Regions:
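Short beta->alpha junction loops
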Residues: 47-53
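Acidic, metal-binding active-site segment of PIN/NYN-like and related structure-specific nucleases
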Residues: 65-83
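A general structural motif
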Residues: 16-18, 68
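Conserved acidic segment of CheY-like receiver
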Residues: 20-22
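Acidic, metal-associated active-site segment
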Residues: 55-69
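Acidic, PIN/NYN-like endoribonuclease modules and their adjacent C-terminal/linker elements
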Residues: 2-15, 24-25, 29-40, 50, ...
């Protein structure tokens, strides 16, 4: 029997390497389920947290930064650099598509392009630190 840290080390590394996401209230619950089940992202969903459900955007932005999570939203208000400066965040991803099916497809492409570049085995947990990215249904298509 080995030392606990030796046994758990590989498991911890896999957990740490998972993309860490803060999904705000504008993200549909079905999309959060897709992030968790299919993409294996570690998602904090504000609608599952009673204290955060009605919090203002600034609070979500600050909390995502404190928790070192990439904020994912459908809310274009976050594109205002004066209110939400990109250099102060753990990454901000504003996604846009007409329906949940297309949003899921968009997240699949984002996962491959940003979190698993060059078919890397271990994902990059926060590829957008200090940056904002606005993507729509045409993003990442060959």
């Amino acid at each position: 029997m080995g030392i606990l840290s030796e046994e758990l080390g590989p498991v911890v590394q896999r957990l740490v390497a998972r993309p860490r996401i803060y999904a705000d209230a504008n993200v549909p619950a079905g999309l959060v389920a897709h992030m968790r089940a299919r993409l294996q992202w570690d998602v904090l969903f504000v609608l599952e947290e009673p204290d955060l459900r009605r919090a203002p955007d600034v609070k979500h932005y600050q909390l995502a930064q404190q928790l070192r999570r990439t904020l994912v939203t459908l809310d274009r208000d976050y594109l205002d650099d004066r209110r939400f400066p990109p250099d102060c965040c753990g990454g901000l991803l504003v996604i846009q598509a007409p329906d949940e099916r297309q949003l899921s497809g968009l997240l699949d492409r984002i996962d491959r392009s940003l979190f698993h570049p060059d078919a890397a085995e271990d994902p990059i947990a926060q590829p957008l630190i200090g940056r904002k990215l606005q993507v729509n249904t045409d993003w990442g298509r060959e």
